[in-house]
Amino acid sequence: MRELFGIVPTLDLHGLGVREAVSETERFLREAQAQHLPSVRIVYGKGHGSPGGRGVLREVIPRWLETDGQHLVARFERRPDASGADGALMVWPKKLSD
């Protein structure tokens, strides 16, 4: 699915530890809700800089969205880059009730 106007607000979590990444993700999604943004992008990377070459955030962030962050998110899906590698999520924040 393409975004109609091309620019999607993006949070880049590269270089952050788990606690800081989760905290930044929550802050970003609350701000997205407050601004009534239809969708946002969260980049966690592929893990090339992580020990073992497998990123921790690629597992932690989606799991957090499904559990503790579910009250902020209507849905999300992984978004591969041009090479087909998974390093980002497209997230649709829940709308705030009036």
Which role does the model predict for each range below?
Residues 1-98:
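Long, charged, low-complexity intrinsically disordered regions
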